[in-house]
From Swiss-Prot:
GO terms for cellular component: cytosol. Belongs to the MoeA family. This is Molybdopterin molybdenumtransferase. The gene is moeA. It comes from Staphylococcus aureus (strain COL). GO terms for biological process: Mo-molybdopterin cofactor biosynthetic process. The lineage of its organism: Bacteria, Bacillati, Bacillota, Bacilli, Bacillales.
């Protein structure tokens, strides 16, 4: 078999080539309760102000601020309570000279009142109370439209729907939401050395860990996943299963078969399905032979058969492709700074991604490699919540150095930071 020529490109360029392709999913309508993690297909515009009316942020008394002027410890001013309202109720009383309405949090400010006195700022009697300080106009009042005004864009097209966005959608009465349909993914593990999870181990064989891992990563994004039977190193059957997967899915992910060995058929498979290879080598470790192709609006990802390299390839390349297909506003991985807490002395001719454990402390983020960090490592992935990104050309890093990390999980808070 002819060895395919491979010219490594930088990670950022590889991602850019992926998101430069013309690929998009159609808009669909889903129930609000099913919209979590989808991408909005349209701007959401405020149809009324928030708050809708002047309201009280506290339990207390609504008064006229002018009546409180001159109040002090030596000159307490008395008010007469003329009404009592809770959230959802509206007083029909007009607050007059030295009058007040007992008001609960969230209730609409009654006519005539322009300030709220909290209960703890008063001395109450049966139907009166006194205060010892003056209040200014609009003090302790949440004003109509102070957060959002009619016509404001409150959620943008391309925004990920998180729980906060669901609260906004519910506020404006969206029982159904127009979103971008999420792509479906086919996962195909390849290699004659692979056994299924429930198979008995044999000499020279390993269980297929990449297939279940990729499925979990895709489902974590909310994607529909199709799992195909583990493929042996056979070109004809490989071509057939990839063609079948392309007919049913928007993204096809294969693991294994991307190196330069005698049984790595992926280049021939891409040729058979007439896919354009966007790149077949990336200047990074692990996963340098990650290959991505594109045809008819669909992506084909050839990820390494080594688990850590496979995981890295999904995080760096599959995730941005999914976001791009869904029209997300942000597609590139988010990078934050962290302090390396252990030496990592291995030289890095290419950009190196290390599975690691990050912790967010009051002094900033810290990070520790999560164990054995060769490309074939499995256990280190389970104990990692980020990847450390070490630039190519470096000769290793010492504890105390500032490094770039990409969070892959959100459980990075130190216990002492929790309330």
């Amino acid at each position: 078999m002819v060895v395919e020529k491979r010219n490594p490109i930088p990670v950022k360029e590889a991602i850019q080539r992926i998101v430069n392709q013309q690929s998009s999913m159609p808009a669909i309508t889903v129930a609000l309760e099913k919209s979590l993690n989808h991408i909005l297909a349209e701007d959401i515009v405020a149809t009324y102000d928030i708050p809708r009316f002047d309201k009280s942020p506290y339990d207390g008394f609504a008064i006229r601020s002018v009546d409180s002027q001159g109040a002090s410890g030596q000159n307490r001013i008395e008010f007469k309570v003329i009404d009592h309202i809770g959230a959802g109720s509206v007083s029909d009383k007009l607050v007059g000279d030295h009058e007040a309405v007992r008001i609960m949090t969230g209730a609409q400010i009654p006519n005539g009142a322009d300030a709220v006195v909290m209960f703890e700022q008063t001395i109450e009697l049966e139907d009166t109370f006194t205060i010892r300080k003056p209040f200014s106009k609009n003090e302790n009042i949440s004003l109509k439209g102070e957060e959002t005004k009619t016509g404001d864009v409150v959620l943008k097209k391309g925004q990920v729907i998180n729980p906060g966005a669901i609260a906004v959608l519910a506020t404006y009465g969206y029982a159904e939401v127009k979103v971008i349909k999420q792509p479906s993914v086919a996962v195909i593990a390849t290699g004659s050395e692979l056994l299924d999870v429930n198979d008995v181990l044999e000499d020279g064989k390993i269980r297929n860990s990449n297939g279940p891992m990729i499925r979990a990563l895709a489902e974590k994004l909310g994607l529909e996943v199709g799992i195909y039977k583990t493929q042996k190193d056979d070109l004809d059957s490989g071509i057939q299963v990839v063609k079948e997967a392309m007919e049913k899915h928007d993204i096809v992910i294969t693991t294994g078969g991307v190196s330069v060995g005698d049984f790595d058929y992926l280049p021939e498979i891409y040729k058979a399905v007439k896919a354009e290879v966007l790149f077949n080598k990336v200047a990074m470790r692990p996963g340098s032979v990650t290959t991505v192709a594109f045809v008819d609006g669909k992506y084909l990802f050839g990820l390494s058969g080594n688990p850590s390299a496979c995981f890295t390839g999904f995080e760096l390349f599959v995730k941005p492709a999914v976001k791009h297909m869904c029209g997300a506003l942000e597609v590139f991985p988010q990078i934050i700074k962290a302090t390396l807490m252990e030496d990592f002395t291995k030289a890095n001719p290419f950009t190196r991604f290390i599975r690691a454990k990050a912790t967010l402390t009051s002094a900033g983020a810290t990070v520790v490699p999560s164990g054995f960090n060769k490309s074939g490592a499995v256990v280190a992935i389970a104990h990692a919540n980020c990847m450390v990104m070490l630039p190519g050309g470096s000769r290793g890093f010492k504890a105390g150095h500032t490094v770039d990390i990409i969070l892959t999980e959100s459980d990075a808070a130190e216990e002492e930071l929790l309330l």
